[in-house]
């Protein structure tokens, strides 16, 4: 069954590394309305990502959640500040198992229907403990989400390696993304626990996956968490999976921040230009240098993200 076209999709950013209350609205980016007392309960930015995806299909609206940020409370807090209703959320998708995308899963579940289990779609590798080792000796621990805690919280765990269709075939989750080019080589100093206490180098992060929606008369809207598979690999795979060449919008992390990834920014942006998306919204781990280069080379497509922005495509 192919991916069905939807009439409209909205992507609402609940968690990102940046919040800027002064950004203007654009053709597709609708910034949150600020109440008079906005400073008493401000939107929170952090090193993490979460976005709600709402599609209109067959005269009905359907809402799903991609990722849940780092802090246990941030996504839920921002949803409250935005008065954003998650009680009708039908599905949660985990882009991968890193804590900055899975840290809020337990608390955000309380905002959803508690009378039924909510499917949580993810790759089995998402349950591996991870870490990042820097050349200067520093390490960052990336503890895995707890399958038992998630089940107790009311999720139905659904582990998928390959692509899967959801919401009346209107949302496609990519599953594992093939690495087909010669410059997006993964995360070389990333490690995964293969047995208790035993870490092995894991540059590919195979659990990385993205969400694809095909908007009628426009093309693909592709939402990533971190884009560890490489944003160009991800976009090309989306085209291959759907048979649709038009890319209308790209929203999410591109993992181009830091010294390991900055050398491929120029090549990545060049390839992104060739793919000709109408809108590019780099988030989270994309990094200032990559965002600046996208803005310079693709000024009509680039949109600066901020927590609370609602994109309507």
Locations of the language-model features?
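Metallo-beta-lactamase
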Residues: 125-209, 273, 303-312
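Short, acidic Gly/Pro/Ser/Thr-rich loop/turn segments
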Residues: 18-21, 73, 127-129, 179-183, ...
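Cap/insert and terminal regions of metallo-dependent hydrolase folds
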Residues: 98-102, 119, 199-307
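N-terminal amphipathic/basic leader segments beginning at the initiator methionine
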Residues: 1-31, 164-174
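Short acidic, glycine/serine/threonine-rich loops at helix termini
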Residues: 24-25, 131-135, 262, 294
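Active-site-proximal beta-strand elements of phosphoester/diester hydrolases
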Residues: 10-14, 64-67, 171-177, 220-226
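Active-site metal-binding motif and surrounding structural segment of the metallo-beta-lactamase
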Residues: 73-121, 242-249
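Conserved beta-strand hairpin/beta-sheet module of binuclear metal-dependent hydrolase folds
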Residues: 17-20, 25-82, 204, 208-224
